Amino acid sequence: MRVVYWVGTSWKMNKTLAEALDFAERLAGFIPGFDDRIQPFVIPPFTAVREVKRALSSTRIKVGAQNMHWADAGAWTGEISPPMLRDCGLDLVELGHSERREHFGETDRTVGLKTAAAVKHGMIPLICVGETLAERESGQADAVLSAQVEGALQFLEGEAKTAKILFAYEPVWAIGDKGIPASADYADKQQALIKTVAGALLPSVPPVLYGGSVNPGNAAELVGQPNIDGLFIGRSAWQADGYIDILGRASAAI
């Protein structure tokens, strides 16, 4: 039985500080009295995380970052450390997005190091996993997902394995402005696999969100699937009205 249903959005490389604060203020005015079965979260760009967190500090909305380094400090020019994110008051951090894997050399090992660092510093890792179209068509999807999940968890030891961890299943072929949403049945099947693999490595099965062209038209059907524990929304939620619309649809469908 679901205790909470996660519904959030990552803004990627979008929004000025003024735009981010406008979104946050709209959301802060909506959330009081909203369905407490749903846990909202937003993931702004680094330039806005502190201010957005402050703007939402009186609400239950969680705020995260889109990436971080695994080291606490050091000669890592251009990187952001876990203590820096905690200093901003952040609750979670998105790790392993396919764009970072493809364009910035992210690997299962570095995702694993970052996952362990996030847990160490009291943040929830939101670990993105997903197969490419070529991997799906060649029958490798299950093997790819299993390897990504195992890699993300490989450096967790002892009590760290009991920390709150989230996965987001984002098939690479389903994301972006040209993405084709996965069918609800297919997404549910792949998310069941992720839960099986993660559940064998952790004391409890972590929640798995679905991300990949989530929109007002498919949100309710996705929410109705037993293995989909939340929605991780892209461009359909980049405007406050769009995000609020999908929050309402998720609430009605639970």
From Swiss-Prot:
Q: Which residues bind substrate?
A: 176, 213
Kindly list the biological process annotations in GO that this record carries.
Answer: gluconeogenesis; glyceraldehyde-3-phosphate biosynthetic process; glycerol catabolic process; glycolytic process; pentose-phosphate shunt
Q: Name one Pfam family in it.
A: TIM
Q: Which GO terms describe its cellular component?
A: cytosol
Q: Does the keyword Cytoplasm apply?
A: yes
User: Which EC numbers does the record give?
Assistant: 5.3.1.33
Positions annotated as active site in the UniProt record: 97 (electrophile), 170 (proton acceptor)
| The entry's keywords | Cytoplasm, Gluconeogenesis, Glycolysis, Isomerase, Pentose shunt
Gene3D superfamilies according to UniProt: Aldolase class I
GO MF terms, alphabetically ordered: triose-phosphate isomerase activity
Q: Where in the cell is it found?
A: Cytoplasm
This protein's pathway reads:
Carbohydrate metabolism; erythritol degradation
Reaction(s) catalyzed by this protein? L-erythrulose 1-phosphate = D-erythrulose 4-phosphate
Predominant location: cytoplasm
Role summary: Catalyzes the isomerization of D-erythrulose-4P to L-erythrulose-1P.
Xref: NCBIfam families? PRK00042.2-1, tim
* UniProt family annotation: Belongs to the triosephosphate isomerase family.
On assembly, the entry states: Homodimer.
Name the chain's protein.
L-erythrulose-1-phosphate isomerase
Q: Which organism is it from?
A: Mesorhizobium japonicum (strain LMG 29417 / CECT 9101 / MAFF 303099) (Mesorhizobium loti (strain MAFF 303099))
